[in-house]
């Protein structure tokens, strides 16, 4: 009985200890560090936003494109000068209407035409020293489509009405040339010359040399040969002069005459002999030796 009273007394005693309170959160230096990092993050976000707006302003970003680059329904449109650091692949490149299209490079500009297997078919290279074209055939045509120049492995064709060579040394052909007409400009000389080799002119239907307003000269160092195998050689002129024919020896008798007769040796050589009452060719046969 006393034990039960003690238990009851213990249960009815008022408790002097209150309930325990646990604080949850960040306090002290941890809280200050957190606020510092949040503030730093906000500053970085503002700087990033400002830099983004500045880049958009400098690069001129718009709804249609960026800077001089415009995106249209037909493709890309570039205004002003453009620089490509890597190869450019395009189906068509054209300038604005009324403006020229320029290609500039510090070294060269190369244009390649490829097939389906990416093999180069034709190539155009414009360098600082030369313009080179690679291909099976090279053609130059007018706006109407008329052929002006063509070149391939077999032949070179000039389709213009006239081919003019303005060089001081003329034109050098290391091999033969075929043409229906060789003509100089009006009031200009036409000279056909072979300094170290022979000059041969051939035609199946004849060769005509005509000088309508001037003289015609044929000069050689050794022999000048006129040969007709099946026909004849005609010298048709009002005056024919042979000023340097050799003269046979003669004995002056009476008055000295200035009239000579033309004699022909058996070997075809011509010489002059002073005319007399009769033929004097037999007297000067020593010239034929």
Curated annotation (Swiss-Prot):
Annotated S-S bridges: 263-288, 265-281
Expression sites (tissue/organ): Most strongly expressed in skeletal and heart muscle. Also detected in stomach and uterus muscle.
Domain of life: Eukaryota
A Gene Ontology cellular-component term: cytoplasm
Cytoplasmic side, ranges: 1-35
BP GO terms, sorted: cardiac muscle tissue development; heart contraction
Extracellular side: 57-289
UniProt-listed PANTHER family: DELTA-SARCOGLYCAN, SARCOGLYCAN
Record's subunit section: Interacts with FLNC and DAG1. Cross-link to form 2 major subcomplexes: one consisting of SGCB, SGCD and SGCG and the other consisting of SGCB and SGCD. The association between SGCB and SGCG is particularly strong while SGCA is loosely associated with the other sarcoglycans.
Listed name of the protein: Delta-sarcoglycan
Organism: Mesocricetus auratus
């Amino acid at each position: 009985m006393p034990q039960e009273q003690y238990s009851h007394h213990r249960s009815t005693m008022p408790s002097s200890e209150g309930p325990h309170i646990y604080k949850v959160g960040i306090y002290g230096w941890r809280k200050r560090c957190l606020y510092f990092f949040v503030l730093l993050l906000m500053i970085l976000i503002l700087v990033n936003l400002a830099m983004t707006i500045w880049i958009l302003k400098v690069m001129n970003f718009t709804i249609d494109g960026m800077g001089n680059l415009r995106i249209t329904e037909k493709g890309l449109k570039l205004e002003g000068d453009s620089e490509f650091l890597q190869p450019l692949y395009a189906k068509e490149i054209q300038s604005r209407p009324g403006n020229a299209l320029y290609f500039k490079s510090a070294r060269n500009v190369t244009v390649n035409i490829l097939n389906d297997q990416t093999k180069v078919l034709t190539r155009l290279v414009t360098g600082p020293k030369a313009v080179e074209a690679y291909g099976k055939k090279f053609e130059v045509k007018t706006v109407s489509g008329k052929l002006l120049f063509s070149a391939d492995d077999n032949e070179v064709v000039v389709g213009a009405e006239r081919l003019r060579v303005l060089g001081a040394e003329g034109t050098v052909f290391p091999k033969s040339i075929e043409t229906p007409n060789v003509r100089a400009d009006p009031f200009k000389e036409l000279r056909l010359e072979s300094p170290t080799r022979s000059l041969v002119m051939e035609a199946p239907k004849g060769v005509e040399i005509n000088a309508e307003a001037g003289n015609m000269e044929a000069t050689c160092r050794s022999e000048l040969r006129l040969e007709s195998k099946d026909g004849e050689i005609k010298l048709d002129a009002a005056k024919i002069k042979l000023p340097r024919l050799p003269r046979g020896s003669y004995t002056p008798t009476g008055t000295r005459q200035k009239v000579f007769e033309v004699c022909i040796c058996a070997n075809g050589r011509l010489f002059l002999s002073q005319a007399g009452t009769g033929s004097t060719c037999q007297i000067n046969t020593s010239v034929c030796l």
